[in-house]
A protein has these predicted regions:
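Sec-dependent N-terminal signal peptides
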Residues: 2-12
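A generic structural signal for ordered secondary structure
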Residues: 10-12, 65, 148
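Sequence contexts marking disulfide-bonded cysteines in secreted/extracellular proteins
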Residues: 22-24, 31-33, 40-45
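A conserved cap/lid and substrate-binding interface adjacent to the catalytic center
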Residues: 39-137, 154-159
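Gly/Ala-rich beta-loop-alpha elbow adjacent to hydrolase catalytic centers
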Residues: 138, 142, 146
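Short glycine-enriched nucleophile-adjacent loop
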Residues: 147-155
């Protein structure tokens, strides 16, 4: 299993095994959560306040506040339905940002299905929790979507 963990904060951290396990659990929990009231699966942690589940055209992410890192979070699952697998095989590269960055078309499409709602939610969460710290994590396809979102966030909010 490949797990991509990205964190966007102003500080850098040394390797912390507990932090890595926390992020793995956060990524894993995206597979079992179906509503914001159901934060009770085996890998769901009490330090997490789940606020949003964003789904569209087979793409999914969960968003909320993480007391463990004192940050907002976005977590993406890996491929879990036929639509995801169709996106996975769309490997031709595109340049949606009008620069030299190339992204596999399927990964970008999967991310783009839920991008707008996630950005709106992040704006609301930033105000609610009074923080601009953000943890972005994902597994497999979700790792690709987490990487794209990181690029988007850094370009949308360069400060």
């Amino acid at each position: 299993m490949i797990l991509l963990i990205l964190i966007i904060i102003s500080l850098s951290y040394a390797y912390d095994e507990n932090f890595v396990k926390h992020c793995v659990n956060l990524a894993q929990s995206t597979y079992c959560v179906t509503s914001t009231e159901e934060w009770n699966c085996k890998t769901c942690e009490s330090s997490i306040k789940l606020e949003y589940i964003v789904e569209n055209s087979g793409s999914k992410a969960i968003q909320g506040f993480d007391k463990y890192t004192n940050s907002l979070f976005v977590s993406f699952p890996g491929s879990s339905n036929l639509h995801n697998w169709i996106e996975n095989i769309q490997v031709n590269k595109i340049s949606p940002y009008n620069n030299s960055v190339e992204i596999e078309k399927g990964f970008y499409k999967a991310y783009n299905f839920i991008k707008k709602d996630m950005i709106i939610n992040l704006s609301l969460l930033t105000k609610k929790y009074n923080t601009n710290k953000l943890l972005i994590t994902g597994h497999s396809l979700g790792g690709a979507m987490a990487t794209i979102m990181t690029y988007d966030i850094l370009n949308l909010f360069p400060e």
